[in-house]
Swiss-Prot record:
UniProt family annotation: Belongs to the calcium channel beta subunit family.
Biased composition (Basic and acidic residues): 462-471, 503-545, 553-566, 575-603
Domain SH3, residue spans: 59-128
Lineage of origin: Eukaryota, Metazoa, Chordata, Craniata, Vertebrata
Pfam families named among the record's database cross-references: Guanylate_kin (PF00625), VGCC_beta4Aa_N (PF12052)
KW Membrane (keyword) present: yes
Biased composition annotated in UniProt, kind: Polar residues: 432-446
Gene: CACNB2
The protein's name: Voltage-dependent L-type calcium channel subunit beta-2
Presence of the UniProt keyword Hydrolase in the record: no
Organism: Bos taurus (Bovine)
GO molecular function, one term: high voltage-gated calcium channel activity
Chain spans, region Disordered: 135-206, 432-603
Biased composition (Low complexity): 142-154
Amino acid sequence: MQCCGLVHRRRARVSYGSADSYTSRPSDSDVSLEEDREAVRREAERQAQAQLEKAKTKPVAFAVRTNVSYSAAHEDDVPVPGMAISFEAKDFLHVKEKFNNDWWIGRLVKEGCEIGFIPSPVKLENMRLQHEQRAKQGKFYSSKSGGNSSSSLGDIVPSSRKSTPPSSAIDIDATGLDAEDNDIPANHRSPKPSANSVTSPHSKEKRMPFFKKTEHTPPYDVVPSMRPVVLVGPSLKGYEVTDMMQKALFDFLKHRFEGRISITRVTADISLAKRSVLNNPSKHAIIERSNTRSSLAEVQSEIERIFELARTLQLVVLDADTINHPAQLSKTSLAPIIVYVKISSPKVLQRLIKSRGKSQAKHLNVQMVAADKLAQCPPELFDVILDENQLEDACEHLADYLEAYWKATHPPSSSLPNPLLSRTLATSTLPVSPTLASNSQGSQGDQRTDRGAPGRSASQAEEEHCPEPVKKAQHRSSTQHHNHRSGTSRGLSRQETLDSETQESRDSAYAEPKEEYSHEHADHYAPHRDHNHREEPHGGGEHRHREPRHRSRDPDREQDHNESNKQRSRHKSKDRYCDKDGEGLSRRRNEAADWNRDVYIRQ
């Protein structure tokens, strides 16, 4: 009987196991459904991969600067597995197109980074909400288990801050903070309780509004597709020392990156182009009533023009009159490359200013204070610091940085010609509006006549790198506009001076003795900057403007002379700088020697 009981138990076990294996076996319908899902997933992945390949040759639709960091390591819903792009805060992304509501197609602007999938703002917002939900649940469980309220707050705050940008990158309009509220010291911005501190509920209520406001920060800020280059230093623009040193760099960049660069002049005060001002109509009247030399309409027009130039993916360099400090552009959407032209020794700068004559030495204190403010800035505010003593070394330093930036923005996979370049240059000459033209020739015409209109200078800069058919078509219209302005203004603008000067006159600007150079240099820079023109004594002003007045007496002869010189200098520059090992190299060496003699005075 014991044996039969044992056999019965064994049979029961066998029958139970067979029943369990029978019920766990999937049916044919389940198998087919699973196969259909897999086939759909593979087809969607194949289509996403094909769209990704096509996007490599498409132009950049727009660019963004990230305010948050994102890691794709644990992302499981990427259209193509392993093709999501990770980034840190303050990185730059080129967006090619929208894939769906959750993903964009683009690339990180870094050398060696290829195209991939970028999370859209909608997806990042959903991720943030999920993260907050999990954080609240964790806080609820920890408080329910008897945890300390201060420690739970300390656990939540650092984790929530990881997904938000530093307070300096907060969009003021999105948070509702004014500019004054946003400039809070760093030690008061994000109070973080230490492990040994005890946090009262009252202090916790004071802290939480800061974190609530930063939650509304947009993950991306739209910026120009190519970050514009802006030069600051060694002192104030409008004085001979700063203008001369920056002019030498502009000349170098114009020829070194010929065909890849647009150098355009900006007379409007683009420091007014803060997101908090342009996006808030209530602040427009305040700005308009203030004593500013630029209207918001003019500023907005200049910002749009810079964005349009950047769409061609050419290097964009701004000769901005009003920008003398990196903080002026920190809250704008331009995201510029700030280049600091630095003279390390204040004594050298002081002696250099005094060597330019009494008219410059009279404003010595103003220039020294401006130079000191730049010297006190942390290095993180600048992208490039040019503190070399030789022109050639400073130029090569800047050229190396811009070459690396060019490679980062032009990956090998997108080496095909940009259709936006020819289309933008052929269809858009970026004309100046009647308001801008009247402003430049009206009440402020005496101060800004020689600077010219921004739209015209941009079209002239574009002529340097546009195709030959487009160049011929634009040359006729730009020449007519140039001749019209030269007859009505008191003197030639700086752009016209650069276009019309020959190689001999350009070399003489570096090689003339200091006494002669100070007067010749003043003719180039005194009219188009505010400081020298506005505060110039009568005697010096009469001498400086003698030649422009003489030129304006005979506009017909001046037009023919400028037109012939413009064409001749353009052909010369093209022939001269195509061969880097030939005559162009010798000229650069001569300029380097003259920079060392004229600009930097040994102690």
